[in-house]
Amino acid sequence: MKELSSAQIRQMWLDFWKSKGHCVEPSANLVPVNDPTLLWINSGVATLKKYFDGSVIPENPRITNAQKSIRTNDIENVGKTARHHTMFEMLGNFSIGDYFRNEAIGWGFELLTSPEWFDFPKDKLYMTYYPDDKDSYNRWIACGVEPSHLVPIEDNFWEIGAGPSGPDTEIFFDRGEDFDPENIGIRLLAEDIENDRYIEIWNIVLSQFNADPAVPRSEYKELPNKNIDTGAGLERLAAVMQGAKTNFETDLFMPIIREVEKLSGKTYDPDGDNMSFKVIADHIRALLFAIGDGALPGNEGRGYVLRRLLRRAVMHGRRLGINETFLYKLVLTVGQIMESYYPEVLEKRDFIEKIVKREEETFARTIDAGSGHLDSLLAQLKAEGKDTLEGKDIFKLYDTYGFPVELTEELAEDAGYKIDHEGFKSAMKEQQDRARAAVVKGGSMGMQNETLAGIVEESRFEYDTYSLESSLSVIIADNERTEAVSEGQALLVFAQTPFYAEMGGQVADTGRIKNDKGDTVAEVVDVQKAPNGQPLHTVNVLASLSVGTNYTLEINKERRLAVEKNHTATHLLHAALHNVIGEHATQAGSLNEEEFLRFDFTHFEAVSNEELRHIEQEVNEQIWNALTITTTETDVETAKERGAMALFGEKYGKVVRVVQIGNYSVELCGGTHLNNSSEIGLFKIVKEEGIGSGTRRIIAVTGRQAFEAYRNQEDALKEIAATVKAPQLKDAAAKVQALSDSLRDFQKENAELKEKAAAAAAGDVFKDVQEAKGVRFIASQVDVADAGALRTFADNWKQKDYSDVLVLVAAIGEKVNVLVASKTKDVHAGNMIKELAPIVAGRGGGKPDMAMAGGSDASKIAELLAAVAETV
């Protein structure tokens, strides 16, 4: 077996499959493009679903890739086991309706065992297979595999919802008896016992059925095109080929671990626990690559995952004695390890370091707050004479402050308290159930549509015309091809068309189809790409249409021009964002409609009003500069050499279309555009908002809509000016500010009067002192305007020794407000209010010295006041 670096393994994999006629699919962005069913790209096949479900036909049906992936369902196991990772690389080879079982197994065995390639010892390889899949068993035997090395497993059948499914066969490497201390042997595989001896290195899925959840597996229909989908983990291959005990001792992780050793002064022991080293080395890879691909730490979705990974890594850094920000110092090391195939981390090093360091600094403040919260919880336990920290409190520390359970346990036990592990697990399960319920259901490859996939007739989109005559090639009605149609809805393909199919954020054209007499025979309501790339026109049929007949196709020209204004303005906006807020502001999505444009981009904070003003100004400057817009076709590399912006994660063909706006903007784009920027007329940003962690959205209008937006603003300003009696529009802001200042003065004066009135009333309230259980208390209903006045009462009460406890109740509108204040350690205000509030159909809580609650049943106020004596 050859001893290869991870980079050599990856390259040899790709080279082998290229020698078998495969094309290399570049690794896609970790943030899925146009796939709302996935939080992250989580496998090598995830980016190829469009090929497997038949919605797109690939240029080459043989594909290979090395795909970075993230899975976060096992975060807690990372560092505890030898092979769990959040980010990993899947090496894959795929056949879309081309070769099948014989080639997949035969070539796979060749790659693994040939001296020209990996050169694995044949006697170290074991294979599992689906018991009913005798063909795979026989193919392995034909390759020279001993029957004793073939293990039938009932679970070796791959399916996920509706769509492609079939048996799979897994390949394992036997690391020998040293990793089998109980000498269990092959039963470890046959009985699926967790072990470190037999390492799964490759899975070959034989997709030959269309799974249908409504019928038994035996009734699944054969796929019109059978597929091969395989995945081999680079980290596991590296561990085996480098003779590493775990994945973490490979060249993918050890350079990171060595840097952590330097930062911590601690030493990594291959035979020791090393959990903290492993957690940091794993999490930093996922964190940096995700940020490089446009995701940013936040409080939801992908952002929450990244924040959790970073905080877990920071806490493990502290366990190693690293109490300063340090993760950002690992960016260079991670980037250098992966540079040969993934240069993006080093290319974006400064930006990634900035984001990670800022997030670490924020978390340092959060840790201080969390420590304070834990101290309060432990103090409360002591006051209440309890010895166990409740699970819900542990979960809050874990979920809100990022405290690992083991850290909470360590600190609590140091203080002499136990941990409610079962309560924590229950709280964790509740959150996981909520998360699962909120997930967008998906992940299935989808059923193949044989009718659409069978369209092979050529069709060409003509960019530079709004009307043309063309022959009708294909009619599909009721999901079947037909020669003619006279009513209802149908899908049409023409030899050529002026209708743009929805793509790249630009909406489809609409329009009409006319016969040779000039009569409208169909209305085009939508245009999408067929699996083989032809524009597929969805039409409402008004009169007879037949294949082979020529028709005149006319798009809605006015609508197209409005869409083009917005699309061209989107390119200007993208360039302006780069210039004003930074090159990290890359496109995360766009929509170019007739009425507006919407542009989503990566950015870690709200765009300020001043920045928006600069962006808007810069775009309009380019419009007024009347820049010439040119489009050319070339290959991707030439386009990039010209400085063309390519959307990261987007797949491009051999020939790409380059749209250049003067010397200001150059982008790869397949959409339609104006001839000159001046045709946009005017550009106006109407909204900027956050739509998720690390993603901002700008909505803007152009042309007539921009003029209307400005006029509406002017009308509103005129109305305000008239209301505040400003002599001119430019004076309106000053008049509004003056009125605001006057209002603030009146509010301050009113508050002072209320405070004096409350102080006067307090004198009467504080006279009525009662006593119970040796505690002096005041319990009274007061007439106040708001809850703030109750706090003013409490502040006055604190100044003198009126009593030990104060309970005030006020009916304000339809709500009952309750305040409890305590000066004695014998009475916990927060606990007391929890007993009193339910009496008035309310709830609340607070600190030992002050607590408030809200209720809704004012009829029970007297009952609440009477209950005070029992609760002190």
UniProtKB/Swiss-Prot annotation:
The keyword tRNA-binding applies. Gene3D superfamilies: 2.40.30.130, 3.10.310.40, 3.30.54.20, 6.10.250.550, Bira Bifunctional Protein, Domain 2, Threonyl-trna Synthetase, Chain A, domain 2. PROSITE patterns: AA_TRNA_LIGASE_II_ALA. Binds 1 zinc ion per subunit. Keywords: Aminoacyl-tRNA synthetase, ATP-binding, Cytoplasm, Ligase, Metal-binding, Nucleotide-binding, Protein biosynthesis, RNA-binding, tRNA-binding, Zinc. It is found in: Cytoplasm. Its cofactor is Zn(2+). InterPro entries: aa-tRNA-synth_II/BPL/LPL, Ala-tRNA-lgiase_IIc, Ala-tRNA-ligase_IIc_anticod-bd, Ala-tRNA-synth_IIc_core, Ala-tRNA-synth_IIc_N, Ala-tRNA_ligase, Ala_tRNA_ligase_euk/bac, DHHA1_dom. It comes from the Bacteria. Its EC number is 6.1.1.7. It catalyses: tRNA(Ala) + L-alanine + ATP = L-alanyl-tRNA(Ala) + AMP + diphosphate. It holds the Pfam family tRNA-synt_2c. One of its GO terms (cellular component) is cytosol. Zn(2+) binds at residues 567, 571, 669, 673. SMART domains: tRNA_SAD. It is an enzyme of class 6 (ligase). Signal peptide: none annotated. GO terms for molecular function: alanine-tRNA ligase activity; aminoacyl-tRNA deacylase activity; ATP binding; catalytic activity, acting on a protein; transferase activity; tRNA binding; zinc ion binding. Consists of three domains; the N-terminal catalytic domain, the editing domain and the C-terminal C-Ala domain. The editing domain removes incorrectly charged amino acids, while the C-Ala domain, along with tRNA(Ala), serves as a bridge to cooperatively bring together the editing and aminoacylation centers thus stimulating deacylation of misacylated tRNAs. NCBIfam families: alaS. Belongs to the class-II aminoacyl-tRNA synthetase family. Catalyzes the attachment of alanine to tRNA(Ala) in a two-step reaction: alanine is first activated by ATP to form Ala-AMP and then transferred to the acceptor end of tRNA(Ala). Also edits incorrectly charged Ser-tRNA(Ala) and Gly-tRNA(Ala) via its editing domain. PANTHER family: ALANINE--TRNA LIGASE, CYTOPLASMIC, ALANYL-TRNA SYNTHETASE. This is Alanine--tRNA ligase. It comes from Streptococcus pyogenes serotype M18 (strain MGAS8232).
